[in-house]
Regions:
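Gly/Ala-rich beta-loop-alpha elbow adjacent to hydrolase catalytic centers
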Residues: 106, 110, 114
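Conserved HGGG/HGGXW glycine-rich cap/lid loop of the alpha/beta-hydrolase fold
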Residues: 12-76, 80
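Catalytic histidine-centered segment of alpha/beta-hydrolase-like enzymes
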Residues: 278-294
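Short beta-strand immediately N-terminal to the catalytic nucleophile in serine-hydrolase-like folds
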Residues: 104-106, 132
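Flexible "cap/lid" loop of the alpha/beta hydrolase fold
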Residues: 115, 125-171
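Conserved acidic catalytic loop of the alpha/beta-hydrolase fold
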Residues: 84-101
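Conserved loop-alpha-helix segment in the C-terminal half of the alpha/beta-hydrolase fold
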Residues: 238-281
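Conserved alpha/beta-hydrolase catalytic His-Asp/Glu region
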Residues: 140-141, 147, 163-238
Length: 304
């Protein structure tokens, strides 16, 4: 993977990985591009188990979102809508080099960025969408029966959000460890046949906590406040391209019922346009079940 950069319309430098160097893309890029969007406090490094396989048949692009990884940040900008505007800039940057069909894969907050993109810019830039382990609203809500059966399990109202912010700012190391434990299915809901050694568990924990530690924790806490309140349900109903929803059966972040709401919302007016795939893993299913993830992503992207 090649490291590339571009500048947003407000001067923020965004880093991204590309399976092809942009200066050599013209005439050699595959017709299909998969754009991998990481989750909260993550980076493009999250997809270390996916790059090689996906790049065999697809042009793979994976940004570090603003305030994450090797990307810079502004004093403000801690809003999902700003991240969606950054994505719009990345899409334009990619298309300067090649006219290509793009299917974005949004994991966790990456899915929220895509739903916000749909609300702001529509669907025309993309041939399809993949939403990975994220419900369209984290908070519980009095509207449309959105309670603990569908909302986030740990950050779902003002009190729990403030507690999460405090931990990210004041107990960052513990917050990073708790995130790793909660997002790896074999840690939060272990099974006898998982076969993950203690050594591998330690390596996985270090891998993810080191990525989270690169971020400005106060900036992240402010992004969290915006993210958890954002209700994307109606925006999802406007999607007009094929949708694949992936969810982890052992995810500690959301109940399956909440994550599968995206399928129901798309199909309210367009039956058959969306489908789901449930993995036997946690929130980071792309890391825990990479072979299945890579296969299903490649098949879906090539079908769009």
């Amino acid at each position: 993977m090649h490291k590339e950069y571009f500048n947003t319309n407000d001067g923020c430098k965004i880093a991204f990985r590309s399976s092809l160097p942009l200066k050599e893309v013209t005439g050699v890029a595959p017709e299909k591009c998969v754009l991998l969007m990481h989750g909260f406090s993550g980076s493009s490094d999250y997809f270390i188990r996916n790059f090689a396989s996906l790049s065999k048949s697809l042009w793979v692009v994976a940004p570090d979102m603003r305030g994450h990884g090797d990307s810079s940040q502004t004093r403000g900008g801690y809003h999902v809508a700003r991240l969606a505007a950054d994505l719009s800039g990345l899409v334009a940057h990619i298309r300067k080099t090649a006219s290509v069909s793009i299917v974005p894969v949004g994991c966790s907050i990456g899915a929220a960025v895509l739903w916000t993109y749909v609300e702001l810019f529509g669907c025309n830039d993309f041939a399809g969408f993949v939403f990975v382990d994220q419900a369209p609203l984290q908070d519980r809500s009095a509207f449309d029966g959105w309670d603990e059966i569908k909302a986030h399990t740990g950050c779902y109202d003002e009190m729990t959000m403030l507690a999460a912010q405090y931990n990210w700012i004041n107990n960052s190391k513990k917050a990073h460890i708790d995130l790793a434990i909660g997002c790896l299915g074999y840690r939060c809901a272990p099974k006898e046949d998982d076969g993950i050694s203690a050594e591998q568990q330690a390596k996985d924990e270090a891998f993810f906590t080191n990525i989270s530690a690169k971020c400005d924790q106060t900036w992240l806490a402010r992004l969290l406040a915006d993210h958890t309140r954002y209700d994307h349900r109606e925006a999802i109903e406007t999607i007009t391209v094929p949708v694949l929803v992936m969810a982890g059966r052992r995810s500690s972040c959301f109940p399956l019922e909440g994550m599968l709401e995206s399928v129901r919302r798309v199909e309210k007016s367009r039956p058959g346009l969306a489908r789901s795939s449930v993995f036997d893993s946690g929130h980071w299913l792309f890391y825990e079940e990479p072979e299945r993830f890579n296969k299903e992503i490649a098949e879906f992207v090539n079908s769009c």
